[in-house]
């Protein structure tokens, strides 16, 4: 859904930088460092996506809101992904792991038994990142935006809109979610409290 990822070409950077270097400072294909992973280790909000793949587009249209937590493992180059989707006013939770390809600057995920990839595009000054996928395919390409805050600035929205047009899509293809329709915050809170209690119990038993 928010993080469906497929291998992409690397022509995005020059197109974006040529548009307006003052407001768009984007790199693609940069190696993923420990610093990048530490920065990614946080709670993120799926803001929206422009997706031409009809199956993915249909899934996003049904989604009212998504937030997720990323927890990298620096030893085995994986990242735990915990997603909270609000669909039809109900919360749907999912947990999985992403692979990290440091040198290529990509993340990977198994979907339907197939390993797929996406380039990570870091927008650190905006507290956001994009995932670009399948840009070579005119019928399936897509670009998603994720941020540390659900209420993004007009500047970040403009950066995303320009990126979408530069990869060959129209702004009208963008589907933004509505963070005010969140139905998962309470469930996340309960899960975190339960995990704290679970961690506490073994320690008390050893005391």
UniProtKB/Swiss-Prot annotation:
Q: What induces it?
A: Synthesis is controlled by glucocorticoids, interleukin-1 and interleukin-6, It increases 5- to 50-fold upon inflammation.
Do the record's keywords include Disulfide bond? yes
**Keyword RNA-binding: yes or no?**
no
Q: Which positions are tagged coiled coil? A: none
Residues of the region (Disordered) are 188-207
Instruction: Tell me the leader sequence span.
Output: 1-18
UniProtKB keywords: Acute phase, Disulfide bond, Glycoprotein, Pyrrolidone carboxylic acid, Secreted, Signal, Transport
> Which InterPro entries does the record match to this protein?
A1A_glycop, Calycin, Lipocln_cytosolic_FA-bd_dom
Any one biological process term the GO annotation gives: regulation of immune system process
Q: Which residues carry this modification: Pyrrolidone carboxylic acid?
A: 19
Q: What does this protein do?
A: Functions as a transport protein in the blood stream. Binds various ligands in the interior of its beta-barrel domain. Appears to function in modulating the activity of the immune system during the acute-phase reaction.
- What information about domains appears in the record's comments? Contains a beta-barrel that binds various ligands in its interior.
- Please give the family membership noted in the entry: Belongs to the calycin superfamily. Lipocalin family.
User: What is this protein called in UniProt?
Assistant: Alpha-1-acid glycoprotein 2
> What is the species of this protein?
Mus musculus (Mouse)
């Amino acid at each position: 859904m928010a993080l469906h990822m497929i291998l992409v070409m690397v022509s995005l950077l020059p197109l974006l930088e040529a548009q307006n270097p003052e407001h768009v400072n984007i790199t693609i294909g940069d190696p993923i460092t420990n610093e990048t992973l530490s920065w990614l280790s946080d709670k993120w909000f799926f803001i929206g996506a422009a997706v031409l793949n009809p199956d993915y587009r249909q899934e996003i249209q049904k989604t009212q809101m998504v937030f997720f937590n990323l927890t990298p493992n620096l030893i085995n180059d994986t990242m735990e992904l915990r997603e909270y989707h609000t669909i039809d006013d109900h919360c749907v939770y999912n947990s999985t792991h992403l692979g990290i390809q440091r040198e290529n600057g990509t993340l990977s995920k198994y979907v339907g038994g197939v390993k797929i990839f996406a380039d990570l595009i870091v927008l650190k000054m905006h507290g956001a990142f994009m995932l670009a996928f399948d840009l070579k395919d005119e019928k399936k390409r897509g670009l998603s935006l994720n941020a540390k805050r659900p209420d993004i600035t007009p500047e970040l929205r403009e950066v995303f809109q320009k990126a979408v047009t530069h990869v060959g899509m129209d702004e009208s293809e963008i589907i933004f979610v509505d963070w005010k329709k969140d139905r998962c915050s309470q469930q996340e809170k309960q899960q975190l409290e339960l995990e704290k209690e679970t961690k506490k119990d073994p320690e008390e038993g050893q005391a």
